[in-house]
C-alpha cells in the first residue's frame, strides 16, 4: 500500500524563517538521551490475544498473539517495520539517474548526511536521528549511514515515462531492489540492515536526485513508503522510503541548513505509523487538522503514535480522581479513558489526553506558517499552535480480520470473530489482521483511527479549517459535561457514554491537573 506525504490540497507553501549560512560539513548527532521512565501502567502489558490465528511476516508466521505495531502491519499491510526493542538501523542511499549532474553530488551527500544523521545545528529543525531520539524519550537511537551514489541506467525522463505507462510503484520498487543488489554485489556490509534470515533489508531510504512533482502526489517523483516485490535469490528491499533530494529545502543549496520534515514523516512509516491526514481528494474533513507529524509533517508525534510504539504508556482513569500530567513532548505523560471492556493494549477504543506545550520538538514549528485552502476554496494561513493547552483524542484502533492482503474488505472486528466454524477454510487459512479504521473518511460519520477533538467542536474540521490555539482545551474547560458539546459523546465499540467527565482544573507552564468526575 502506497503511503504518501501530501501537501494539503496542493496549495501549501512553507513560509520559512530566515537563517544565516553554516559551513558545508557533516557534523554527526552524538547526543544519546538516557531513556526516560515513561511507562505508567500498574503492571506489564501482556500480548493481545486474538481469537483466531492470522498470518504475519509475509505468511511465514501463524499466530494469535499481537506483541507490537511492526507485527500488526506485517500482516494485512505486508510491511517490514522496525521491531520494538531492537536497534533501528537506517540505510540511506542517494540515487542518481543517468543524466544527473554529478558535479552536485559531493555537496548533496553532505546535506543528506546532516538531514538524517547530523547535529541539530546543521538543520532548520532536527535531523532524523536527533528527532527520533528526542521524540522517543531516549528509547530509540537511529544508527546508520549514507552510502555512495547509485546511478541508474535510466534517465529521469525514461523512469518517469515508464511509471506513466505502467505505475510508479513497480518502477521505484525495481530501483530499490537494484540498489540492494548493487550493495550486496559490491561487498557493502549489509549485516546491520538485514533481517535475521538475511533475505530483506529493513530501514532502506532512497533519496533520488530529481525534483518532486508538487502537482501530482501519485507521481513517481514524490515522497512515500512502499513495499517492494520480495526476491528470494538475493537480499531485497522489502519496505523502503522514497523521497527527492529537494526536500532538504531550496535554501539548503545556498545556506547549507537542511529541512528534514518530510524525511522525519516518512521514517515514521518505517516505524509502522499511518498517515493521519485524509487522503481522499474529494473530502475536506481532516481528523487531526494538520496538527501532527503524521499529518502535516510538523511537531512531535502524538500520544497515540507513541503508545503504539511503546515509547510511553498512559495513566488509566478507573475512578473519580485528579491526575497531574507534565508536558507530553518533554516527559511522555498522558492519560487514557477506557471503555468498560478495555483490553489493556493500544489496539482498542479509548480517549487520550495530553498536555501540549510549544516547547521541545513543538518549538520550531510553533513559529512557522503555511498556506492552504479550505472547503470553500478560500486561501488561509495555518499557524502552528503556540499556546499551552490540552489535546484530547478519540482513538478507535480496534483490529479487524481480512481475508486478502490486497483487498481492503474486512471480515469483522477480531473481538467479534469467535463463533466461526473452524472447518470453514475462508476463515481458517487466509486470515490477516489490520486496523479496522483509518483517517481518510469519505463522510464525517465514518469511524476514525485517530481523531483530535477540538475545544471548538467539529465545524472547523468539516470545513477543512486547520487547527489553531482555540483547538486546545484551556483552563476550566470541560469535556463530557452537560455544559459542553461532548456531553453526548459515545464510544463506537459499545455505544457507551463516557464513564467520566473532566475539567481542566489547574494549568501551569510545566504541568496541568485534570479532574475526573462521574458523568453527570
Label every PLM stretch briefly:
Residues 24-263, 274-282, 393-520:
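Propeptide-to-catalytic entry region of secreted or membrane-anchored zinc metalloproteases
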Residues 135, 203-205, 209-369, 398:
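Extracellular hydrolytic enzyme modules, especially secreted metalloproteases
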Residues 1-2:
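N-terminal secretory signal peptides that target proteins for export/translocation
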Residues 322-325, 335-337, 353, 392, ...:
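Hydrophobic beta-strand residues in large extracellular and virion-surface proteins
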Amino acid at each position: 500500500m502506497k503511503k504518501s506525504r501530501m501537501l494539503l490540497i496542493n496549495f501549501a507553501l512553507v513560509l520559512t524563517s530566515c537563517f544565516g549560512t553554516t559551513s558545508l560539513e557533516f557534523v554527526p548527532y552524538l547526543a544519546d538521551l538516557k531513556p526516560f521512565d515513561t511507562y505508567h501502567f500498574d503492571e506489564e502489558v501482556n500480548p493481545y490475544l486474538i481469537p483466531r490465528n492470522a498470518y504475519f511476516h509475509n505468511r511465514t508466521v501463524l499466530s494469535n498473539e499481537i506483541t507490537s505495531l511492526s507485527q500488526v502491519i506485517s500482516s494485512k499491510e505486508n510491511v517490514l517495520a522496525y521491531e520494538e526493542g531492537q536497534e533501528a538501523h537506517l540505510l540511506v542511499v542517494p540515487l542518481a539517474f543517468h543524466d544527473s549532474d554529478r558535479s552536485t553530488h559531493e555537496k548533496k551527500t553532505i546535506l543528506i548526511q546532516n538531514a538524517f544523521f547530523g547535529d541539530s545545528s546543521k538543520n532548520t529543525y532536527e535531523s532524523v536521528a536527533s528527532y527520533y531520539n528526542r521524540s522517543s524519550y531516549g528509547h530509540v537511537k537511529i544508527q546508520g549511514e549514507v552510502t555512495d551514489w547509485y546511478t541508474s541506467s535510466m534517465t529521469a525522463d525514461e523512469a518517469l515515462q515508464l511509471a506513466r505507462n505502467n505505475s510508479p510503484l513497480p518502477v521505484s520498487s525495481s530501483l530499490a531492489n537494484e540498489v540492494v543488489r548493487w550493495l550486496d554485489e559490491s561487498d557493502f556490509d549489509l549485516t546491520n540492515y538485514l533481517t535475521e534470515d538475511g533475505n530483506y533489508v529493513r530501514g532502506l531510504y532512497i533519496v533520488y536526485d530529481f525534483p518532486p512533482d508538487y502537482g501530482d502526489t501519485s507521481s513517481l517523483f514524490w515522497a512515500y513508503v512502499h513495499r517492494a516485490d520480495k526476491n528470494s535469490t538475493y537480499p531485497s528491499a522489502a519496505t523502503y522510503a522514497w523521497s527527492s533530494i529537494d526536500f532538504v529545502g531550496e535554501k539548503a543549496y545556498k545556506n547549507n541548513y537542511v529541512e528534514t520534515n518530510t524525511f522525519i514523516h516518512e521514517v515514521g512509516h518505517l516505524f509502522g505509523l499511518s498517515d493521519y491526514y485524509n487522503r481522499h481528494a474529494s473530502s475536506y474533513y481532516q481528523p487531526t487538522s494538520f496538527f501532527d507529524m503524521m499529518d502535516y509533517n510538523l511537531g512531535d508525534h502524538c500520544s497515540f503514535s507513541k503508545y503504539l510504539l511503546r515509547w510511553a504508556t498512559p495513566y488509566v482513569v478507573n475512578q473519580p480522581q485528579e491526575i497531574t500530567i507534565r508536558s507530553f513532548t518533554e516527559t511522555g505523560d498522558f492519560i487514557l479513558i477506557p471503555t468498560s471492556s478495555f483490553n489493556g493494549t493500544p489496539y482498542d477504543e479509548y480517549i487520550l489526553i495530553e498536555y501540549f506545550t510549544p516547547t521541545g520538538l513543538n518549538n520550531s514549528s510553533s513559529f512557522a506558517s503555511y498556506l492552504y485552502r479550505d472547503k470553500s476554496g478560500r486561501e488561509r494561513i495555518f499557524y502552528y499552535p503556540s499556546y499551552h493547552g490540552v489535546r484530547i483524542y478519540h482513538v478507535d484502533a480496534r483490529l479487524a480480520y481480512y481475508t486478502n492482503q490486497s483487498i481492503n474488505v474486512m471480515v469483522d472486528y477480531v473481538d467479534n470473530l469467535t463463533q466461526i466454524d473452524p472447518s470453514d477454510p475462508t476463515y481458517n487459512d487466509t486470515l490477516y489482521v489490520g486496523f479496522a479504521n483509518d483517517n481518510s473518511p469519505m463522510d464525517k460519520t465514518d469511524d476514525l483511527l485517530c481523531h483530535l477533538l477540538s475545544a471548538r467542536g467539529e465545524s472547523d474540521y468539516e470545513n477543512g479549517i486547520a487547527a489553531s490555539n482555540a483547538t486546545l482545551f484551556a483552563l476550566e474547560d470541560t469535556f463530557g459535561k452537560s455544559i459542553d458539546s461532548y456531553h453526548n459523546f459515545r464510544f463506537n465499540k459499545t455505544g457507551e457514554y463516557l464513564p467520566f467527565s473532566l475539567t481542566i482544573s489547574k494549568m501551569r507552564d510545566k504541568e496541568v491537573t485534570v479532574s475526573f468526575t462521574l458523568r453527570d
